[in-house]
Amino acid sequence: MVDQVKKSQTDLKKTNRSYKKKLTTPPTVLKTGKMDKILVISDLHIPYHHPDSFRFLNKLKDRYDWDKVINIGDEMDWHSINVSHVINPDLPSAADELEVGKFWIKKLEKMYPDMILLESNHGSMVLRRAMAKGMSKFFLKDYNEILDVSSRWQWKEFHWETNTLGRIYFAHQVSKNIVKSVQLMSASVCQGHYHTQSNI
């Protein structure tokens, strides 16, 4: 199964030439009070991630000395157990999606062994599926055990940072309107979820 996913990603790379540009644009670096550099990763949707995403993340690792890595959600897609969309029976099963997902998550953990990850609509799908069926979260394994990662990866509902200009609120989603998000939190907001939107 892992080999099939690798092959499909290789094939996608060959057909999608528009994404073959060299990584020349440096990312935006958030400076905190201690001048920390924070890498924000959002919406990978493993195993359906973009074929260049891991190459890109590896280049960022080699190019910058990140003080902190915050994954603002949807690290996994969990299409096979989705509670709010029709499940495509021709896509990988839950077991297959987990097997392939763990393969890629291990690569990500090797690149970034310390990470804060935020609860999200896809990343939290196992819990959402259990709750939809009336099962308590206390019957479930934690994310670290499900994905076979160390306790250096920490899942949280949201995360706050403070820099010289004020506070930054990190969450998977607050509001599609970023101005409303900022007003609601009375702080700068960094969120994911809205794939086609990029606002400052």
Model-assigned labels for residue ranges:
Residues M1-V40:
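Acidic, histidine-bearing metal-coordination/catalytic regions of metal-dependent phosphoesterases
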Residues K21-L23, P51-D52, R152-W153, F170-Q173:
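Short gly/ser/thr-rich secondary-structure transition/capping motifs
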Residues K31-K34, D62-D65, E109-M111, D148, ...:
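Flexible, charged surface loops at secondary-structure boundaries
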Residues D36-I38, K68-I70, I168-Y169, S188-C190:
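Structural motif
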Residues K37-I46, G166-V174:
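Active-site-proximal beta-strand elements of phosphoester/diester hydrolases
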Residues I41, I46-S150:
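Core catalytic region of metal-dependent phosphoesterases/phosphodiesterases
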Residues L147-T164, N177:
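Short acidic low-complexity segments
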Residues T164-I200:
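Conserved beta-sheet core of the metallophosphoesterase superfamily
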